[in-house]
């Protein structure tokens, strides 16, 4: 019996390592894609961490399917090969039917650093996540990261990221966020990754600043691009004029909002200061809504056309981005 169990485990892990990443959209994902390790429900593992540990030191492509539930875990993903996490959902095209939540509560001062406070620390290249909610439940009072994303070719599809201060640490690398929900109040999207946020809901749950980008040198190709996003306040809160599009964490922050809907939560000045001596590059083009008037904007630079995915994600973006989103 023990030998048979070992063989079964070997077969499961081997299948997960060989499984291809999904590049087509389904209306529902209520069972594991072929070859994935399984977590929760009737799956093999009870925790996400245990499933990830089972992948070991391989560099083969791998995937993990997570059944509906709330997983109280703090996770760091460092893996040599491409890794995809799938959450159970009845609608893969949106975050609204997500059933999987990963949650942890700790502040950066308590943890010792921003990254150490992250509920999910994706510290690898070729990391992809579908239809999973990531929460840092700390709330007001200190920085507390939900997702720390550090890597090339990272993709997040139909996910939710919830916190208050420093929710999403788009730290370094190249990242794509599609049809996601991102909630916070103070600097809740920050870092020096080059990141494209497409068709996302950017939701403020308090007065503050959406972005705190940390680009420092003119040679750094990084952008934060918000394309066809909806920018608004959390239901039940009156934040009229209380939210800024961003402030520069470092001196050459570069952010653009394009073809997006900006609600009345956006302060007429649009942008404000942070780093001493900063000369940020802040752009707006093609936006609509009560917060889109740029006539009183501060620190706004001119731009003649919306930026492209190639500009933000690099010339190889067509090779790794999930086209179904």
UniProtKB/Swiss-Prot annotation:
Any one of the GO CC terms: extracellular region
Protein name per the record: Pectinesterase A
Lineage: Eukaryota, Fungi, Dikarya, Ascomycota, Pezizomycotina
Compartments in which it is found: Secreted
PROSITE patterns named in the record: PECTINESTERASE_2
Biological role stated in the UniProt entry: Involved in maceration and soft-rotting of plant tissue. Active against citrus pectin.
Keyword Magnesium among record annotations: no
Glycosylation sites: 126
GO molecular function, one term: pectinesterase activity
Chief localisation class: secreted
pH dependence comment: Optimum pH is 8.0.
Temperature dependence comment: Optimum temperature is 30 degrees Celsius.
EC numbers: 3.1.1.11
Gene name of the encoded protein: pmeA
Catalytic activity: [(1->4)-alpha-D-galacturonosyl methyl ester](n) + n H2O = [(1->4)-alpha-D-galacturonosyl](n) + n methanol + n H(+)
Positions of substrate binding: 143, 247, 249
Site (Transition state stabilizer): 165
Keyword annotations: Aspartyl esterase, Cell wall biogenesis/degradation, Glycoprotein, Hydrolase, Secreted, Signal
Pathway: Glycan metabolism; pectin degradation; 2-dehydro-3-deoxy-D-gluconate from pectin: step 1/5
One Pfam family per UniProt: Pectinesterase
UniProt cross-references to InterPro entries, sorted A to Z: Pectin_lyas_fold, Pectin_lyase_fold/virulence, Pectinesterase_Asp_AS, Pectinesterase_cat
First and last residue of the signal peptide: 1-18
GO biological process: one example: cell wall modification
Entries under PANTHER family matching the protein: ACYL-COA THIOESTER HYDROLASE YBHC-RELATED, PECTINESTERASE 53-RELATED
Protein family membership: Belongs to the pectinesterase family.
Active-site residues annotated for this sequence: 166 (proton donor), 187 (nucleophile)
């Amino acid at each position: 019996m023990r030998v048979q169990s070992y063989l079964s485990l070997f077969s499961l892990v081997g299948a997960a390592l060989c499984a291809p990443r999904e590049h087509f959209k389904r209306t529902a994902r209520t069972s594991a894609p072929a070859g994935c390790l399984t977590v929760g429900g009737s799956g093999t593992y009870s925790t996400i961490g245990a499933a990830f540990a089972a992948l070991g030191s391989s560099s083969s492509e791998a995937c993990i399917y997570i059944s509906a539930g709330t997983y109280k875990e703090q996770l760091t993903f460092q893996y040599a090969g491409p890794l995809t996490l799938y959450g159970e959902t009845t609608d893969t095209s949106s975050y609204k039917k997500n059933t999987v939540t990963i949650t942890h509560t700790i502040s950066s001062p308590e943890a010792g650093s921003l990254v150490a406070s992250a509920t999910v620390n994706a510290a690898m290249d070729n990391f992809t996540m579908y239809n999973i909610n990531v929460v840092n439940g700390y709330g007001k009072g200190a920085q507390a990261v939900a997702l720390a994303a550090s890597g090339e070719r990272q993709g997040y599809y139909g996910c939710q990221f919830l916190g208050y201060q420093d929710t999403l640490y788009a730290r370094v690398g190249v990242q794509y966020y599609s049809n996601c929900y991102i909630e916070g109040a103070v600097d809740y999207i920050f870092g020096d990754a080059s990141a494209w946020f497409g068709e996302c809901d950017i939701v403020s749950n308090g007065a503050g600043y959406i972005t705190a980008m940390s680009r420092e040198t003119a040679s750094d190709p990084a952008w934060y691009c918000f394309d066809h996003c909806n920018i608004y306040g959390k239901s039940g809160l009156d934040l009229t004029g209380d939210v800024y599009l961003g402030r520069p964490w470092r001196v050459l922050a570069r952010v653009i909002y394009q073809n997006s809907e900006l609600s009345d939560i956006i302060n007429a000045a649009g942008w404000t200061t942070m780093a001493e001596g900063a000369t940020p590059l802040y752009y707006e083009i093609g936006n609509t809504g009560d917060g889109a008037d740029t006539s009183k904007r501060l620190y706004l630079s001119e731009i003649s056309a919306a930026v492209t995915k190639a500009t933000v994600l690099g010339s190889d973006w067509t090779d790794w981005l999930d086209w179904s989103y």
